[in-house]
Design a protein with these regions (language model features):
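N-terminal maturation segment of proteins
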Residues: 1-303
């Protein structure tokens, strides 16, 4: 389990950074700085690794495990098998989405990347330098989707193009310069000379890698405009319904069918509404009390 954790968490340095504040405490001292690998070779390696994980799990005697261990076993087995089952539908994945796609989320992650040590700063700068290559892989992936008739709609594509163009406006005063400088100023243990050096390096990485990455992505997507064959959403692709069911299982951990889950939600909603109606019928003043109630952030977090 520890080996699986280390392998998976170090596949993407951003995930590692936001998951573990001090990797050394977990024995993770030597890891490659990477944004991940989207190549077909990497995908094949990932599938082989999943098969090895499942093989490793099968070596355990399930009945001899504790209840907690059985729960861990079940979760891992389901997670690994689910990914393998849908591996052939990888082109249904969408890396570029208006609010949650890579192009939208990566700048936020860079902005919020905390600097707790000199190594954090150096890892961050290395990630910036890798961004254009990573975006090139995204472009290749989107072209492959287009060739397969699975490219996004023109509306979604134009939205992302506009985002990319907006991101590089006023690059001399970009927020990734300002936020970097603020974090560097707060980091103790660096000399003024080191801080000045890192500031210059950050601006250089933005000019040479980040801004060109977004320019190239916008240009590539512009070339792909008109490649989309479906304006109606995921379920309208040939195997879109099946992929949606996979996403539901992957994101919720539920093994029930879509129809069963819909019924469960509907029944629970009816139950809650009925309970609310009964309470307010017996105590009409609850309506007024509810409208007057206010919650502090602490209250809402614990409610």
């Amino acid at each position: 389990i520890n080996d699986i954790f280390e392998t998976e968490v170090t596949e993407n340095t951003i995930n590692l950074h936001f998951t573990i504040s001090d990797p050394e405490k977990y024995g993770i001292t030597d890891y490659p700085v990477t944004l991940g690998d989207l190549s077909n070779d990497a995908m094949s390696d990932s599938n082989a690794r999943l098969e090895n994980y499942l093989s490793g799990l099968s070596s355990f005697s399930y009945t001899e495990l504790t209840l907690n261990q059985q729960l861990t076993y079940d979760i891992l087995e389901n997670y690994f098998q689910l990914q393998l089952d849908m591996a052939d539908m990888y082109l249904y994945d969408e890396l570029l989405r208006p609010s949650t796609g890579v192009q939208a989320q990566l700048p936020i992650l860079y902005e919020e990347y905390s600097f707790n040590s000199k190594k954090d700063v150096e890892d961050y700068l290395k990630l910036l330098a890798l961004t254009d290559e990573y975006f090139d892989q995204i472009i290749s992936f989107e072209k492959e989707k287009a060739d397969a008739g699975l490219f996004m709609s023109d509306f979604a594509c134009q939205n992302i193009i506009d985002q990319c163009n907006a991101f590089i406006v006023d690059s001399d005063n970009h927020y990734l310069i300002e936020t970097f400088n603020t974090r560097i100023d707060k980091l103790t243990g660096l000399t003024q000379s080191e801080k000045d050096h890192y500031r210059l390096q950050n601006e250089k990485m933005l000019r040479e890698h980040i801004f060109p990455a977004y320019e190239n992505l916008a240009a590539a997507l512009t070339d792909l405009l008109g490649s989309g064959t479906n304006e109606n959403g995921l379920c309208y692709f040939p195997e879109g319904k099946q992929y949606y069911e996979y996403l539901l299982a992957y994101n919720t951990g539920a093994s029930e069918s879509v129809k069963t889950l819909e019924n469960m939600i509907s029944n629970e909603r009816v139950k809650v509404l009925q309970e609310s109606s009964d309470l307010t019928t017996e105590n009409p003043e609850l309506w007024e009390l509810a409208s007057e109630a206010t919650l502090t952030p602490t209250d809402s977090a614990t409610t």
